[in-house]
Amino acid sequence: MSHISNAEWEVMRVAWASEEVTSSYIIDVLQQNHDWSDSTIKTLITRLVDKELLASRREGRRFWYRALISEEMGQWTCVSDTFAKICVVNHKTLIEKLVADTPMSLADIDDLEKLLNIKKFGAVDKVVCQCLPGQCSCQHH
């Protein structure tokens, strides 16, 4: 997936929320919370079409858009790209912070506990830094 800006992400969220949307609907939704002009939003839509993240079709004078990737795939790509930039030794601390800061139901917590119990079977003795020397401060080089 191509890198998308925060503003483009907002457009994708509108597209993910419905099977297919018009440009005017995207504009209406985003202008509720942003001071963006119609042309700015149309430019964002065009960029996403160019990046092959949105498909477009014309019906009369109206343009319809639909997401070409799932919301789950978009979210996973965003998170995995971020984690790829961070020393693997620090991932656990970040995950702990995410868990601490994320509202969860008891069922969500049960699911995480089950996942961690399964993860124990393939656990390594020590997580080894994969960074090039001089790229991080984890002191594992």
Question: Model segments located where?
Answer:
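Short, cationic-aromatic polyanion-contact patches
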Residues: 3-7, 59-79
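Pre-recognition alpha-helix immediately N-terminal to the DNA-recognition helix
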Residues: 6-14, 25
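Short beta-strand "wing" residues that participate in macromolecule-binding interfaces
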Residues: 56
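C-terminal regulatory/oligomerization modules of transcriptional regulators
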Residues: 100-141
